[in-house]
Amino acid sequence: QVAGKKLVVIEKDDQGKPDLGKSLLASAYSDDKADIAVGPTSSGVAMALLPVAEEYKKILLVEPAAADAITGDKWNKYIFRTGRNSSQDAISNAVAVDKAGTTIVTLAQDYAFGRDGVKAFKEAIKNAKLVHEEYLPQNTTDFTAGIQRVVDKLKDQPGRKVVMVIWAGGTPPYAALAAQELSKRFGIDVATGGNILSAMA
């Protein structure tokens, strides 16, 4: 209970679909009389929910969607975030790989989380050289062509070579990358997000 009122939790599954998420949130606010909503997981869904919260003048607590735009240029006063955002991820990732003589290719999903993550990562690196951004659909399960484009951009580069993966949900590319033995065959390292605490110190 809060202030003598019983809390009721209603779960709704947006299935990672922005249009479905939008209609479910509108229904929660109007039909279920929800005062606050929490979620979603997908940044793409979160972007679709922002104007709904503003229209109904009700709070949307975004967690764990991480695209910067959620509390950046698309933000409104009904939106709150409890977790990290893409820029925080990017800064910590840059700390790990941003060294002179390093060449980087990014591999990301083609939606708000992936694009915001790459944008923030590009802004955070100062010493390494980013030579290509590879974006794949969220529902990708065959990574062969995308990985080949990554290899083609990196294999002949001098110095350390890194593919920075910015991926959330769906089928992640890590098993496909490991199967290609990039380090053994081409000297290409695979890097991805990690703990941000040391980078924030």
Predicted regions and their residues:
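Surface-exposed, flexible loop/turn segments at secondary-structure boundaries
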Residues: 17, 45, 68, 87, ...
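Extracellular/periplasmic Venus flytrap/periplasmic-binding protein
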Residues: 23, 68-69, 77-185
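Short beta-strand segments enriched in small/hydrophobic residues
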Residues: 1, 40-41, 102-107
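Short active-site oxyanion
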Residues: 34-37, 162-164, 188-191
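Beta-alpha junction/loop-to-helix N-cap segments that form part of ligand/metal-binding clefts
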Residues: 2-72, 82, 136-141, 170-177, ...
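Extracellular/periplasmic periplasmic-binding protein-like sensory domains
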Residues: 179-201
